[in-house]
């Protein structure tokens, strides 16, 4: 039985968010199916999610949450070792709408259940409604029997934060200060919420992300802690690249920053794609009221930085770009 914890915060109770490079018990995923978001009836997306789940499974357990309509399809396609759980959601981004797990020094595990509003709510969110996504974190906590803290009304997605596990949070002003998140709170108040609910002491604010239109600039496309005192950061020397200015600014900021322990950060460069990735097949995506329409030629946010660290490996995205191999080699050297 999982309970809601009220009248306290994770920091007061001795809990912190662990870094992504710390040991993991498993990975949770959501299964894509929205015809108004994914092309070709979500079949290419399902194949990609299947490949990701299969790759992760080599290193740790995987649970995939699936709607009732897709349960049989997902169960038959996913490896038998993958746990498939029937769960309703509005889309497939559990990193953003799922729980932020916490640990303490005695092996205890808890979680934060942030309020989720589809990356901007009625201001600039990607779809409406989002109520099922906002229930995902609590459902996962119930299944895992993990007690949780609910930040009712305080909006945050998992992809908007990275931590080093030693007191430092990494985020962007573009996202957390956006009008569609927490417009009633100042930067200082948001920073205090991050420290209280992630068990941290210092927040590093990169100014801009590379995705202003969909996630409002999530940090997981820009930079990530890979070890205590070390971060990876997107990089390009191509002044014509659409993300050149953001990459240069982020690298400069991190190169001059120190973490919560006072260490000057060691910054590793991770290349961007050689060419921008452009959306194709928009005519196979359904147009539905309440959802932002897709158009051919839109710049897709293709960032090698949006990798996943698992136990003993890194699952790094590939885009059919000539820099795919470069990114793999750079990742291996980190």
Residue ranges, per PLM feature:
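Histidine/cysteine-enriched polar flanking segments
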Residues: 1-334
């Amino acid at each position: 039985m999982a309970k809601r914890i009220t009248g306290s915060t994770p920091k007061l109770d001795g809990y912190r968010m662990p870094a992504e490079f710390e040991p993991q018990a498993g990975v949770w995923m959501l299964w894509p199916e929205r015809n108004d978001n994914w092309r070709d009836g979500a079949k290419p997306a399902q194949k990609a999610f299947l490949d990701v789940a299969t790759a992760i499974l080599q290193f740790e357990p995987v649970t995939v949450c699936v709607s009732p309509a897709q349960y049989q399809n997902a169960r038959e396609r996913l490896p038998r070792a993958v746990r498939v759980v029937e769960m309703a959601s509005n889309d497939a981004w559990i990193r953003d709408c799922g729980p932020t797990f916490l640990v303490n020094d005695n092996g205890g595990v808890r979680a934060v259940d942030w309020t989720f509003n589809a990356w901007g709510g009625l201001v600039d969110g990607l779809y409406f409604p989002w109520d099922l996504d906002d229930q995902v974190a609590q459902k996962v906590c119930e299944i895992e029997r993990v007690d949780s803290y609910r930040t009712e009304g305080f909006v945050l997605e998992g992809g908007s934060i990275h931590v080093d596990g030693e007191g430092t949070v990494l985020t962007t002003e573009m996202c957390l200060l956006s009008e569609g998140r927490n417009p009633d709170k100042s930067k200082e108040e948001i920073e205090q919420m991050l420290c209280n609910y992630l068990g941290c002491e210092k927040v590093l604010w990169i100014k801009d992300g590379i995705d202003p239109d969909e996630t409002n600039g999530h940090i997981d496309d820009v930079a990530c802690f890979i070890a205590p005192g070390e971060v990876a950061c997107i990089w390009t020397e191509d002044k014509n690249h659409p993300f050149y200015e953001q990459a240069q600014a982020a690298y400069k900021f991190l190169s001059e920053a120190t973490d919560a322990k006072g260490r000057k950060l060691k910054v590793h460069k991770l290349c961007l794609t050689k060419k921008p990735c452009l959306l194709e097949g928009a005519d196979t995506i359904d147009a539905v009221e309440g959802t932002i329409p897709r158009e051919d030629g839109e710049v897709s946010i293709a960032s090698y930085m949006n990798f996943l660290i698992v136990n003993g490996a890194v699952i790094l995205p590939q885009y059919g770009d000539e820099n795919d191999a470069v990114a793999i080699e750079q990742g291996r050297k980190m």
